[in-house]
Amino acid sequence: VRALTEENGIVLIFDEVMCGFRVAYGGAQSIFGVTPDLTTMGKIVGGGFPLGAFGGKKEIMANILPAGKVFQAGTLSGNPVATAAGIATLTQLKENPPYEYLESLTDKLELGLIAAAEKHQIACQTNRVGSMLTLFFTGGPVVDWSSARRCDTHRFAEYFWGLMDQGID
């Protein structure tokens, strides 16, 4: 994707709202070894408080005021409490990275889910990046929208609501 966007003069944007600081300190881009032109982040950058951020290559960011002509503002811009919480969270993640431990727990969860499904003869697949894990009720790999659409969504709903009923949310 990176090569394709560069060849065609297209800005590559990564939405790290889900993966940023969750799968690795450098987000999904550090795992996959792809540097986008712009990155967006969500509330993790605010330590769980409402805050959003974006950043990118110097030549793009130079277009943002005060240096450039593009005005950017928002409800979640620069809240001091969220910013302080974000700095504390990011400092903690950098100084005491939890990623290896989280992945080891996810390994156990994934193996347990697969074993339980096999025991009850339920077809399922797991997709995973770092500690982010998704369970699909299907017999084949889920690699795109078409394969995801073929999953047993009714079984997933039963699974989901069963977890909720047990207080697992």
Regions found by a protein language model. Give the residues of each.
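Conserved N-terminal phosphate-binding loop of PLP-dependent enzymes in the Aspartate aminotransferase
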Residues: 1-169
